[in-house]
Amino acid sequence: LINSFAIGYMNTDPINDNRNHRFYAEFVLFCSGMLGMVLADSFLWLFIFWELMGLCSYLLIGFYYERPSAAYAAKKAFLTTRVGDVFLMVGLAMLWTLFDGHLDYAYVFNDDNIAKVDPASLAWALGLMFIGAVGKSAQFPLHVWLPDAMEGPTPVSALIHAATMVNAGLYLVARMFPFFGSEHMFGQLDDLAFIIAAIGGTTAVMAAAIAFVQTDLKKVLAYSTMSQLAYIFTGLGAALYLANTLHWHGAGHEVEHGIVVVAFGAALFHLFNHAMAKGMLFMASGAVIHEVHHAHHHLHHDDHHHEPSPKELVMLATYLKEKDQSAFEFFTSIDLDDSGEIDTYEFKEALKSAEIADLPPWEMEPLMNAIDLDGNGKINVPELDLTLTRVLLEEAHDHDDHHEEFDAQSMDNMGGLASKMPITATAMLVGSLSIMGFPLIGGFWSKEGIIANTWRVALDDPRFMYPALCVLLGAGMTGFYMSRMWLKTFAGSPKGEVAAHVGPTNTWIKTPLFILTFITLSGIILASMGFTHWAPESKGELLHDSLLDGFLYEMEHAFANHDSFFFILSYVALFFGAIVGPGLALSLYGGKLDDGETAKPWFTPVLALNAAIKGRYHWDNSALSESTLATALSNRLYFDHYYDMAMLKIVAAFSFKAAEADSGVIDGTIKTIERTSQQLSTKLRALTTGSARDYILMAAIGTLVLFGLIWGVVA
């Protein structure tokens, strides 16, 4: 589906001309990396495909490498995830040692082989592997790379957040389940399970808080991904704890078996629901950005439809202007044969000598054609002068037009798009409701399961009270920032002329949105089919006789739970996620559409409620938006700043020591050998007198020495 979306997105933007072949090659390799990792039958193959995805993410995030921000984001993602990968490699090495040189799943997950392993050593190995998952899935404290990864094309963002990369870390942790569920490790790995849940809870709240103040549409979704993945980590932590502390194998333990299977299944079901919803949200956001960008382009470029000048000509014109050199002077300097005309070779050498470009012949041809006005295959002075003058005038005009850079991703440049992009608005509404955990939609069933299972563990182990409170608080926070995003984009009046001229999306983009919207709305069907019952050895014991039985079972546990604590908990979570968070957003953002603008019938209740609440309360959040907390959240809680400072101090201190070692030890050794060689050669050179008598004497002495050595050996 994302590939289909990419065709409509990438092929209609002129900026991607002559580079789409590279995009699709890297894109398909990225997908292959994740597929290979899931199909791998050993941790070794998992690691190989894991690294392949790391390479592809670097290439795709930095796809527009000519932009400094994209190049920086690619390096940042690559290096940050490499930190986690170092720990993963050490953990795998420990696992390889513990299991006598085996990393195959069939061997390491065998109960008899697990029984031979020291529990403390296995806990350390799995803990180090978990750090690798933290880096890959952008969890605290290795989370800083994910927001910057939005520099890549939107299809890449959709793929990273929905189907690959960040999900790889979750898959790795889920793959550890047999270790935690082994009877031979009973009660030995509960501390690691708590750490997994605590990291997840911390990241869930932190990322949701930062999403509150984001104005970039894709970055809101990036922090949403970080937060929702943290939910899954928390759910996995709770499930792994239950698997490690409950006797759930064999006859007589059916209840415990059901608890473990459903806890593990809820986390994986949320991974599925999140993938569907987030893939749809990123594709919908890409459609919005695509159309906003095109609307801005048409508004500001309708008055000059000329093709942009080749960048080499722009650089040449700028070069001559800085050198204060006329076209005639430049022409004379490169007309090597004084023919009064410049051929392709002379022009190519001129660009090379000016350090502008060293182009192959096939790229020189369109450049020559841009200057060669009479079409004779050569350039004369008037043609060059006229072309360079035109290029400078275009640059000056473009600079005047773009003295304020327009940001097509900023929600501050959107608003009121529900009437202009109804299909996209519908997809984003359904996806947002799923992420929020709105009743009966996909994400509701899995998120409620994660919250319930985390609290189930918290009642048994007080340490889990922290992640349990985090996921409950995160439910309300998710409701706020997802509602804020939709309202700022689709409700209210257009924020500027560009938003007022946005048009609908093309078919290539609409089709995946239709399909993913349907799947997301089908969450109740999937839940009724037993999608939460994923675990080894489950064998369908908890699956229901019919779809109706499954539906009634899920509805009863969600809204009429027999346990009074979980009955109250489900409604508290629902109150925070579906009422408090969205209600606060409705009172602060959006509003009614402009007069004359109409929305689809299914939007009418949402927009009417938004207009009524905002019109009644008129809350002003300007003071809060300028507070110290808001500033800190806008700066990502200064993690990047502190990391940069720490790295600078560590790297700078290390570099000085390395420089001393380099100059004193490495260079010193080489220079000592060099000096010794020079001194020895000087002394040997003194023996070269040019006298035949001296040479005969040295030959005789050498012969006697050799004779003496041979005589000694023989004797």
Give residue ranges: language-model regions.
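Aromatic-capped, Gly/Pro-kinked transmembrane alpha-helices
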Residues: 352, 530-572, 590-715
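Primarily EF-hand calcium-binding motifs
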Residues: 323-339, 361-382
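Amphipathic regulatory helices of Ca2+-sensor modules
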Residues: 313-315, 341-358, 380-393
